């Protein structure tokens, strides 16, 4: 479970599609850094769970990184969900497809699905988040070296 939560620390926003042979950066191992895992969970809740679900993950598993039910409710849950519920979103997939061209994928198993001969899924996620670049030819104004022609903008850009 700690590995899944560590990956959440690295997944503040993702839309994945076809694979890539882009060389992967080595992701830092944060599996034993509870503060980093808690920050990652907060980033994931604030940035990713607006469009992406994590239906194989329940809010109460955040206890594994030292959060209380009260902290989970106050800082990571923004709907009427219960702490034992799965991490769903209210956006209808049909609306998402209309707005974005495709429904954003569920992120709960994305690290497993992105493991390849190039490296573990955590390395793909880490590389993906770090390789956005401006591309005025794209509808969002952004593209990605690890996932060319990505449909999602660089949501961590500030």
Each PLM stretch: what is its role?
Residues 1-31, 158:
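Post-cleavage N-terminal segment of exported redox proteins
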Residues 27, 110-112, 155:
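Short strand-loop junctions, especially beta-strand C-caps/beta-turns
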Residues 42-53, 103-112, 124-127:
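C-type cytochrome heme c attachment motif
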Residues 57, 113, 158:
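Short loop/turn segments at secondary-structure transitions that flank enzyme active sites
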Residues 62-110:
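Structured domain cores in non-transmembrane regions
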Residues 124-158:
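Extracytoplasmic/lumenal ectodomains and periplasmic regions of secretory and membrane proteins
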């Amino acid at each position: 479970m700690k590995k899944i939560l560590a990956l959440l620390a690295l997944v503040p926003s993702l839309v994945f599609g076809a694979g890539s042979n882009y060389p992967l950066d080595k992701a830092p191992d944060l599996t034993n850094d509870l503060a980093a895992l808690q920050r990652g969970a907060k980033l994931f809740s604030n940035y990713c769970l607006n469009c992406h679900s994590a239906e194989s993950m329940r809010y109460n598993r955040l206890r594994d990184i030292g959060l209380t039910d009260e902290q989970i409710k106050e800082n990571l849950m923004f709907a009427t969900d219960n702490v034992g519920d799965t991490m769903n979103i209210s956006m209808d997939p049909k609306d998402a497809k209309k707005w974005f061209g495709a429904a954003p994928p569920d992120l709960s198993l994305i690290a497993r699905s992105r493991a390849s001969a190039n490296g573990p899924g955590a390395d793909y996620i880490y590389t993906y988040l770090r390789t956005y670049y401006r591309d005025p030819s794209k509808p969002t104004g952004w593209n990605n070296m690890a996932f060319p022609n990505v449909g999602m903008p660089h949501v961590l850009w500030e």
